Amino acid sequence: MAANSKTAIRLSLRAGERIFINGAVLRADRKVSLELLNDATFLLENHVLQPEDTTTPLRQLYFAAQMMLIEPAMREQAGATFAQMLKGMFATFKDAEILNALKLVDELVHNGRVFEALKTIRAQYPREAELMGAQPVVWPVTKSGKSAGANP
């Protein structure tokens, strides 16, 4: 998210939580509140998608956009990857809801509002799952009463 001088952004971090600010990674050693008073681009740790979680087209697009925020040295490369992926998605997706969201994402990124683009992409995850026929994972219960997917 980008903070500007007109409105300060207040953030609360838990002990051990990380935040990415202008490409730097900060970790709180205890519960802390921060106030960003000037222009800063940041991403909270719970919004950072890990490479192994890029299992759908929208998650892959999110990852490319995310890299523009948290790896400034790779911004140009990530931007090119993002643009290529977005172009492919316009050719692939036929759903009006997702296509409209992708148009907004394209505009947001073009205007330097990458954090807002990330929020827009995340909001489309349920629709993408619906279109892909994804079902929530439900582990069968064994005779012992434990979920088969649970750790022993």
Curated annotation (Swiss-Prot):
Pfam annotation, one family: FlbT
InterPro entries (UniProt xref): Flagellum_FlbT (IPR009967)
Domain of life: Bacteria
Key words, A-Z: Bacterial flagellum biogenesis, Repressor, RNA-binding
Primary role: Has a post-transcriptional repressor function in flagellum biogenesis. Associates with the 5'-UTR of fljK mRNA and promotes its degradation.
HAMAP family (alphabetical): FlbT
Family the UniProt entry places it in: Belongs to the FlbT family.
Name of this protein: Probable flagellum biosynthesis repressor protein FlbT
Gene that specifies this protein: flbT
